[in-house]
Amino acid sequence: MSLLEVSDLSVVFPGGRGTLPWQRLPNVRAVQGANLSIRASESVGLVGESGSGKTTLGRAILRLLHPTEGTIRLGDFDVTGFGRRTPRAYRKAVQVVFQDPVGSLNPAMTVRDIVAEPLRLNMGLQGEALDERSAELMGLVGLEAHHLDRYPYEFSGGQRQRIAIARALATTPELLVLDEPVSALDVSTQSQVINLLERLQRETDAAYLFIAHDLAVVRHVCQRIAVMYHSRIVETGPADAICDDPAHPYTALLIASIPDPDPAVQREKTSRRRALGRGVAGATGAPPVNACPFAARCPHVMDICHTSFPTPIATAAGGEVACHLHTTGPMLGGRPLSELDPDTDEA
């Protein structure tokens, strides 16, 4: 049974005013028809380039914004049925670690105040019990109890992110939303924080929604991956299957974008990346409503891709892919995507 179940979720932001008083800008469809599930104690990665809608989806799960359509369920909670007020029990069950460890910590508060705040508000701890639990959380993330009396500016970026993780773990959450938790850190610090997150999951049994743009990092941390492009989830599946045998052309493009230390391999990857993306740098304009968002960049594009978004179908690896290549194109007979030459194959 799934801990989190997101069904047909859409988030549409209203367009603002144009240059002239009577002009209205079109609505922005940040997320369209998203389906995602996370089991208890499972790590699921949500990957995609900037502007794909992955952070918006995470914020909808956190109740930091209200979805336009669809449902979100967390265990017994019907999240989309809460109305304007969010129950305290849901706040305890779902916590977040933001990308920027500097901006997410109040510089006017000591670490003790930062870590203790959710303990007071949600757990009702006070006095000695509050101090003991705060010190315990600091030890859990590899910091000392004496660090509690310092301010955020006295710590490095990696230490600040550890403090943010300690704060998120204070309520013993069932689900932790990690919004690019290592993107703002240097490489050596990234590995330390990733190892910390893996250890903490084993110790706490919390489920992770790991939002990132680095597929290599997500593969290391997560059991399953969902790939998002320009408001749509285009592929889901086990992490190894997604990375070793992608079923969607955009997933293949992401994998080809991972740097390789071998110059010969890197040249081959660069050539494949350019072919897969048709030389287009990234998604531009508003996401289409009734078309595949990757159609403008896909080397295997067909006429149907411009007129309808494909219904996701099951893959052999146990995931799903939303691509017309698997329903009406050359992969209908089971031909793997890796055999399609983006330079010569006409879908």
Predicted regions and their residues:
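Conserved ABC transporter NBD signature motif
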Residues: 70-81
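ABC ATPase NBD coupling module
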Residues: 20-25, 79-95, 113, 121, ...
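A short, proline-enriched helix->beta-strand linker immediately N-terminal to the Walker B motif
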Residues: 170-174
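Conserved ABC ATPase signature
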Residues: 151-155, 159
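Conserved ABC ATPase "signature" region
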Residues: 77-78, 128-146, 255-256
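P-loop NTP-binding/switch modules centered on Walker-like glycine-rich loops
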Residues: 175-177, 181-267
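Short catalytic/signature loops enriched in Gly
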Residues: 2, 15-22, 27, 238-347
